[in-house]
Amino acid sequence: GTEANEVAMLMARVSTGGRGIICTDAGYHGNSTEVSKLSRPPQDINAEIRAIPYPQRYRPLQDGVSESELTELYLDEVRTAIDAFQASGIPLAGMLVCPILANEGLPDIPDSFMARASEIIHDAGGLFIADEVQAGFCRTGEWWGYEVNDFVPDIVTMGKPMGNGLPLAGVIARKELVDNFRQHRRYFNTFASSPLQAAVGMAVLDVIETENLRQNASHVGDYLRSELTKLQDRCEPLAEIRGQGLFIGLEWVSDRHLKTPDRDGAVVYVNRLKDKGFLIGNAGALGNVLKIRPPLVFTREHA
């Protein structure tokens, strides 16, 4: 995934002639020198990276506004980042985000934000990159996370889920972008076109199709969220249940009214479940979101 995002950033920069990349302030896209710049606190990000507040409904930029007004507030953050690049003499290359904001805690994204942000990026001469390393391959009940938010990116990156854990990654883009990239930049990878990785990747696609795992993720995910919702009345710290398919985020708080994040409490439950043989994690900018991501073969009986 790291290398896929690095190639995608390079492709966007070569294709547009720009350098500036917009990301969110709580994402994670890899650990190489260049890609890790997208995952640092805003004050540590260099001049060619601008981080915006990630769009969400639970802790919005401003309380008491309508859905459309909230969307506009977050879109203004995109516009402000573009203006800041222009003021610094840095042309825009694009915006890179996970389309379901997985590491941000799977927040409920204000309506039409992704589609309209993509339009703003295009109008400014940039490209929209969807990091599908976590969201892709039917995890959400759709093949791709960007389908959940009803938009089409210019570049899509993929990682180890496409090989079911075997090291495998990929970058997909429109033909003209790929042709332009190959014409202006020499890219070589010793491990490209590996027969073993290719065979595993094809096997993963076959299993997803023949075992109807996309539909399974959608149906079982709906059931699991409905069962978790029944627990809310008995579980005060469980403030909100979010996500799509078999990718679920639970907002864990110490006070529902004040929405006080409880990272320590979330970590306690992560470890308790680990002791019982269930592996989940904590995510989000505040570290208080329980991230539940079972295998695509997870059934109602398991749930």
Question: What residues fall within each predicted segment?
Answer:
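Conserved N-terminal phosphate-binding loop of PLP-dependent enzymes in the Aspartate aminotransferase
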Residues: 1-303
